[in-house]
């Protein structure tokens, strides 16, 4: 019986690579030695992949970053109060993509960095008319905040105040008329603005959904066929 046990041990050693595993089992082997280094290396590779993914999403383009609001916050712990800062940042590429994010940290620069990273991950695309204004009017709401957004002719400019202006500047909108009702909380105003922007649809997407041509939709407003076709060609996502 002893010989059979030794033979089984030798076979197990040969199967694992030639050297017997003399390290302690369970806790000792799992937390120390080469295994721990391997786990650290694995985490490093995952971080590298995550970094490359963010660069691909940005596409190497320079983003417009707007610091909307920063305030001091506190957290009550056993030893007293811990003070920190909360930042609200809006990020956009100026070509129809924008997002917002918030971050908290003990120092202001770190809070802004966290908020910027969160905003980049939450970017959404909004269809623009002629690359300068919205396709149609819209309403957005979040909490006690309500906003109304309206498309405007060329040369109007951005008629918006506070946090809403930062959103449209980052988005690349140059002509828009807005109005906010209710709370002046910047967090609620930003969320209400994005709620209105996410409801924007272009005539091209509506035509595809209904199985029609863009010129057919634009010609219903009394415009001639030639004018409708010209307007359809001028529409850009």
From Swiss-Prot:
Compositionally biased region (Basic and acidic residues): 20-55
Keyword Cell membrane included in the entry's annotation: no
A GO cellular component entry from the record: small ribosomal subunit
One Pfam assignment: Ribosomal_S5_C
Matching PROSITE patterns: RIBOSOMAL_S5 (PS00585), S5_DSRBD (PS50881)
GO BP of this protein: translation
Start and end residues of each stretch annotated as Disordered: 1-59
Keywords from the named record: Ribonucleoprotein, Ribosomal protein, RNA-binding, rRNA-binding
SUPFAM superfamilies membership: dsRNA-binding domain-like, Ribosomal protein S5 domain 2-like
Residues in S5 DRBM domain copies: 63-126
Alphabetized GO MF terms: rRNA binding; structural constituent of ribosome
NCBIfam families: rpsE_bact
PANTHER family membership: MITOCHONDRIAL RIBOSOMAL PROTEIN S5
Described purpose of this protein according to its UniProt entry: With S4 and S12 plays an important role in translational accuracy. Located at the back of the 30S subunit body where it stabilizes the conformation of the head with respect to the body.
Self-association and partners: Part of the 30S ribosomal subunit. Contacts proteins S4 and S8.
Family: Belongs to the universal ribosomal protein uS5 family.
Protein name: Small ribosomal subunit protein uS5
Taxonomic lineage of the native organism: Bacteria, Pseudomonadati, Pseudomonadota, Alphaproteobacteria, Sphingomonadales
């Amino acid at each position: 019986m002893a010989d059979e046990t030794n033979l089984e041990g030798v076979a197990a050693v040969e199967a694992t690579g030639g050297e017997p595993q003399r390290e302690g089992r369970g806790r000792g082997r799992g937390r120390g030695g080469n295994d721990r280094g391997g786990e650290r290396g694995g985490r490093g590779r995952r971080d590298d992949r995550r970094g490359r993914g963010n660069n691909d999403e940005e596409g190497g383009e320079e983003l417009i970053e707007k610091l909307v609001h920063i305030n001091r916050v506190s957290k009550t712990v056993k030893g007293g109060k811990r003070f920190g800062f909360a930042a609200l940042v809006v990020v956009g590429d100026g070509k129809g993509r924008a997002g917002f994010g918030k971050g908290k940290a003990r120092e202001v620069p770190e809070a802004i960095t966290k908020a910027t990273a969160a905003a980049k991950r939450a970017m959404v695309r909004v269809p623009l008319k002629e690359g300068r204004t919205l396709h149609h009017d819209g309403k957005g709401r979040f909490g006690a905040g309500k906003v109304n957004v309206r498309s405007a002719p060329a040369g109007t400019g951005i008629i918006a105040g506070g946090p809403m202006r930062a959103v449209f500047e980052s988005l690349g909108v140059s002509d828009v008329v807005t109005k906010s009702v209710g709370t002046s909380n910047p967090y609620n105003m930003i969320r209400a603005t994005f709620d209105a922007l996410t409801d924007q649809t272009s005539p091209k997407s509506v035509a595809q959904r209904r199985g029609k041509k863009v010129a057919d939709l634009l010609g219903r407003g009394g415009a001639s066929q030639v004018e409708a076709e010209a307007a359809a060609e001028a529409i850009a996502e």
